[in-house]
Amino acid sequence: IYEPIENIHQDQILKYSKIPADITSNIYKNAQDTAKLISEKLDYVGTMCVEFFIDQKEDLLVNEIAPRVHNSGHLTINAFNISQFENHVRAVCEFKIEEVKKIANAEMNNILGKEIENYRKRTFSSEEHFFDYGKKIIKDKRKMGHLTKLKK
């Protein structure tokens, strides 16, 4: 189980994700326990994202269950020893599941629409990992890539 990832949305589109999430240890534990319970009750195999809202009483409300790898988890490619993508393939192919270990705290920014043009021209530091999805048609608010910044 990966640690909770904090997401910020803009116009109903994921704009930014980060670890560690700015949550209490109680919310952290409840989020992991609830996600695990959902997975067990569904007898689910593979990567699943459970998205929560936190109310003013610090209760968790399940907003979405995504039975797949999820955009918010793209930072697992660089911030963990094993990504959500590899773990998903391992699970569905019944390969050994590796223990998840965090390498670094991280932030991931989705690159939307024409923003991609500036990113394609940039030079990145060794802590920055740029992913260009190679989409030929640029549309406003379309996810064109992402940038993960490791916080070592």
Describe each PLM feature range:
Residues 116-121, 152:
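Short, conserved charged micro-motifs
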Residues 123-124, 149:
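Expand to "…catalyze enediolate/carbanion chemistry for C-C bond making/breaking, isomerization
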Residues 139-148:
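Short helix/strand-capping connector loops at secondary-structure junctions
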Residues 55-58, 112, 151-152:
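Short acidic-glycine loop/turn motifs at beta-strand connectors
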Residues 108-109, 147-150:
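Hydrophobic structural segments
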